[in-house]
Amino acid sequence: MEQFKIDLNLGRSQQHDFIYPLIFQEYIYALAHDRGLNRSIFLENAGYDNKFSLLIVKRLITHLITQMYQQNHFLFSVNDSNQKKILGYNTNLYSQMIFEGFAVVVEIPFYLRLLSFLEGKERMKSHNLRSIHSIFPFLEDKFAFLNYVLDIQIPHPIHLEILIQTLRYWVKDASSLHLLRFFLHEYPIWNSFLIRKKSSFSFSKRNQRFFFFLYNFHVCEYESIFVFLRNQSSHLRSISYETFLERISFYRKIELEEVFTKDFKAILWVFKEPFLHYVRYRGNALLASKGTSLLMNKWKHYIVNFWQCYFYIWSQPRRIDINQLSNHSLDFLGYLSSVRLKHLMVRSQMIENSFLIENASKKFDTLMPITPMIGSLSKAKFCNVLGHPMSKPAWSALSDSDIIERFGCIYRNLSHYYSGSLKKRNLYRIKYILRLSCARTLARKHKSTVRLFLKRLGMGLLEEFFTGEEQVFYLTLPKASSTSGELYRRRVWYLDIICINHISNYE
């Protein structure tokens, strides 16, 4: 038990007042401003204007601190949503930049801790682990031998103070945390940061990086304790997850010390399952096990109580589904994943007799779902709800080469991401929709017919919808039938895909 306490106490920051002076450095906000302008690769541009004054940001922060320590400090109220100026300046842009500056500054101690941890250790190529596709080879290796999976929707914190309290265990800088708390509570349009959807919350486009940092940090906190208990109860340590845990260390909350000391043995019996695997991406997680339905129900109730008791997050049990892998498909990261039995007939030859032996093996399949994809194309006006291609009038003013390049780029991105699909029939249908939509857009622009345009462009239009691997196959394999058959059976996972943003880049 003493060893558990020591392990949970790792990672406390030893530096005080480290972040607070950086908040007043102009280069921090210049860095945040430049990163906001150039982050369209990962997130959509927040609409920053080039007209930006670092001096105004500094004055705003100084004014906020002055107001914070005054007794009557409410410069603007949360209920007063029409108040948009401080000291005569528009606060929308500068409040965003202050949040971005906070994000840059707060990330510094975590990055330094990571570098100090990696000193003297063999560094892995983490850029490969950043790829979304790196998850699927892991699922292929592990999930084929498992029976049940928990499909979990991770809840958001219901109060800002939960995020601040979690952050203060890592950053021992009371001044900066007080300023952050004051700014969050006094910012008049905080409610616009969280957009409520059907069954979950999502962050709005404004200040995404800062609130993604807070939310991801909160998720890593509960995952650290969760995986710690899992590893302490099993001889099969989670080696594949160890790399990600290097970035975060475990800690012990003061109020939980009695709980861990008193109930540790009672909790660990739930975790004694060696074939247990956990995968998370964004707000969804999968917990798969080789155990029975009863064991998965215990996991479900434990996770709900874990969130409520330790992190004060209310989560309804219906947000966690128990599915059997053999007869249920998982909708995860845009793929429909399932485990199916593959039957093989083997002929065994004896001296005089021969007989057939049937072998059954499990195989992990990944398929591209066609219905959601057609829905996305329909929303973007490339086709109707039935999947019939339409012209794109909004692009008619572009040049012919730009129109063809845009359609071709969308298909190449989709083909690149869904290269892991076992069957390419749905991807070929998407290719047909985009090609015909491109031809109809060009015909609409030149007031001609689709037939004439297809005849005029010929292979020129077709080549724009070739992916890199398709071009290699068509050059190396002369027969079209063998090429299409080879492409149909190929399943490729790439290590350079870090986001899913196929269509929105052009909308």
From Swiss-Prot:
Any Pfam family: Intron_maturas2
Disulphides: none
InterPro entries: Domain_X, Maturase_MatK, Maturase_MatK_N
UniProt GO BP: mRNA processing; RNA splicing; tRNA processing
GO MF entries: RNA binding
Intracellular or extracellular location(s): Plastid, Chloroplast
GO cellular component entries: chloroplast
Keywords for the protein's UniProt record, in alphabetical order: Chloroplast, mRNA processing, Plastid, RNA-binding, tRNA processing
Keyword RNA-binding part of the UniProt annotation: yes
Family: Belongs to the intron maturase 2 family. MatK subfamily.
Function summary: Usually encoded in the trnK tRNA gene intron. Probably assists in splicing its own and other chloroplast group II introns.
Name of the protein this chain belongs to: Maturase K
Annotated source species: Kalmia buxifolia
Gene this protein is translated from: matK
